[in-house]
Amino acid sequence: ILLFGQDKFTAKMMLSNEKLHRYNIIWRKVLKSGFLNANRMPLREHEDIMVFYKSQPVYNPQMVKGQKNHSKGKAKGENAEDILNNRVYGAYKVVETTGDMKHPSSIWEFPKSHPSIAISSTEKPIELCRYAIRTFTNPGAVVLDNCCGCGSIPIAAKLEGRHYIGMDNGVCDNKKSKYFGMPWADVATQRLAEVA
């Protein structure tokens, strides 16, 4: 389960089910917001993605190219043998890793849509949604978005070969959008029809 939020909403969601909350990912939006309060507080350029689950879910790390991996070297000291027996992970072998592919971090950077072209103020970039879907699901899985707005997550699911369920009972309130006044479910359906 992935939930997006900021500030007190994030805290409330995390505490609403402490047993299932596992960790947060930071979505760095690149475009900052909050300019009217810039002399009172820092500009905001991130949102939290809270990850909840009962047992270890599908996790397909999206590797990124980086500098070539370096050797971990040899363990030194009295307890060098203990390196191979960890109280959390148990016995393990040291594996030399080569290459330049790196595991992703807890900060994901995807630019949000500029307000002049965004359909919704809470719209998520399709590329961010695709990345999350590739990370936490396998092809053919079902992706549920229970507040899908303009349909970014269902569109991303379709593009990634997943099935999707999207629902929303709101209405587009962005007066600059061609969808102004339309129910979000209709907006999402129309946008999905445009995706090959």
Which role does the model predict for each range below?
Residues A193:
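Conserved phosphoryl-transfer catalytic core
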Residues I1-M167, V171-F180, A185:
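Core catalytic lobe of class I
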Residues A196:
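Short Fe-S-cluster ligation motifs
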Residues A188-T189:
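Conserved SAM-binding loop
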